């Protein structure tokens, strides 16, 4: 089976490479010629465990190809996946210009039946717009060619995307014809044979499922952060509360960890887009408005704790930051809490020394040389008046606290992810603040 994946960003590259891994003949398309040339050499533009090796292996095997021209491969493929970006507009709605541009290109160049599958996260109704865009181009040509549209939203976690694709919780597919369902069944047959759950539904429901899933997870995070903040006020320990409620099978243990807010390429964008979708339908998503409000406030919680400790006198203080990416195992800093924190620290007159195992170049690209980029976590802590744990990378879990204490100007640790034990930290002579206790 031959398919094309348009867009070699996070979703497109992982999707195309993983399909190639199970034997599908894949052509990945991107208009960025520099990126395509790099991919042909096995150089990938994102940090994702196991992906680079898989790209190299499947490129050598001839199952994975890269091109800047969708037109050049369109005749050869049965299915075209659209995995281009859908960045938020100023009003929070999803910008579908790239998605519709792909649809128009297909309509301008297709010569026989195609199944056009939207992989990008898009609002309900996008498939109709894609169908109309393709049909308009066919009408301009006077061409009568059958085609189908479908929705196949991704549920990949950055840092674990390859495993998520190869061993999915579920695969959601929205179709509107028997022909489209048969093609998607053929494509996902290896997953069905391994007893992974493939769920077929109508297209609007598939489009809504992605937004609903991410918004539900964002809601859990904001709820636990709200509970954590209340725990501090009433003398409860949020870690104990988390253990208590997580043991309830109706709730579970996932996404009930308090912290300094969610970030990344999905949750912030998708919550905003779902709120906007509701507004356009004359409905207000009251819960999601609160979710956003809590999250924005939570990103400043460590800074507020720091201010309180130093009685609002932060001018000239040196602050160490461990972790810049929005989560471990990625270099993604989109909507990262670290960006908010760094901005607040610099405005308060602080000097910032930061270290992240993967996101240093990305941070430098975003904010330039306004902070010191440390060589390791110990270098970041040098002469620091406070150390802030922002991203819970594994290498931060068991540092040599004796070395850290000697290195720092003041033994103050603010743990934004609750990965350290308060009693142990205090026994080692640190002043320790965390979230929710």
Where are these regions (language model features)?
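Structural/interface elements that position substrates and couple domains in central-metabolism enzymes
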Residues: 1-437
């Amino acid at each position: 089976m031959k398919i094309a994946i348009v867009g070699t960003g996070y979703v497109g590259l992982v999707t195309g490479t993983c399909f190639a891994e199970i034997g599908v003949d894949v052509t990945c398309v991107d208009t960025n010629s520099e990126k395509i040339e790099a991919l042909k050499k096995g150089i990938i533009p994102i940090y994702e465990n196991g992906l680079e090796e898989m790209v190299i292996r499947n490129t050598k095997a001839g199952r994975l190809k890269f091109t800047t021209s969708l037109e050049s491969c369109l005749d050869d493929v049965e299915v075209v996946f659209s995995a281009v970006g859908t960045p938020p507009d100023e009003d929070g709605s999803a910008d579908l210009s790239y998605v519709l541009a792909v649809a128009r290109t297909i309509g301008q160049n297709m010569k026989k039946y195609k199944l056009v599958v939207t992989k990008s996260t898009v609002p309900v109704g996008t498939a109709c717009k894609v169908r109309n865009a393709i049909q308009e181009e066919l009408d301009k040509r006077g061409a009568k060619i059958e085609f189908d549209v479908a929705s196949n939203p991704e549920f990949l976690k950055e840092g674990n995307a390859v495993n998520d694709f190869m061993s999915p919780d579920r695969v959601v597919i929205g179709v509107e014809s028997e022909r489209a369902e048969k093609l998607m069944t053929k494509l996902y047959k290896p997953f069905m044979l391994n007893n992974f759950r493939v769920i077929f539904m109508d297209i609007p429901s598939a489009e809504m499922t992605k937004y609903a899933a991410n918004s539900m997870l964002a809601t859990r995070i904001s709820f636990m952060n709200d509970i954590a903040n209340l725990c501090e006020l009433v003398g409860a320990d949020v870690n104990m509360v988390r253990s208590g409620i997580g043991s309830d099978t109706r709730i579970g243990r996932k996404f009930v960890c308090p912290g300094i807010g969610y970030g990344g390429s999905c949750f912030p964008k998708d919550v905003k887009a779902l709120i906007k979708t509701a507004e356009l339908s004359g409905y207000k998503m009251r819960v999601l408005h609160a979710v956003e409000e809590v999250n924005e406030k939570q990103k400043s919680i460590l800074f507020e704790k720091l201010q309180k400790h130093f009685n609002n006198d932060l001018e000239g203080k040196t602050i160490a930051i461990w972790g810049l990416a929005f989560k471990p195992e990625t270099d993604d800093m989109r909507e990262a809490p670290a960006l908010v924190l760094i901005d607040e620290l610099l405005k308060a007159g602080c000097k910032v020394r930061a270290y992240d195992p993967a996101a240093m170049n990305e941070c430098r690209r975003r904010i330039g040389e306004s902070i010191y980029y440390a060589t390791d976590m110990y270098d970041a802590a040098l002469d620091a008046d406070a150390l802030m744990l922002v991203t819970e990378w594994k290498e931060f879990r068991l540092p040599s606290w004796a070395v850290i204490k000697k290195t720092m100007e003041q033994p103050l640790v603010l743990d934004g992810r609750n990965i350290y034990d308060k009693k142990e930290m205090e026994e080692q002579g640190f002043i320790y603040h965390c979230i929710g206790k």
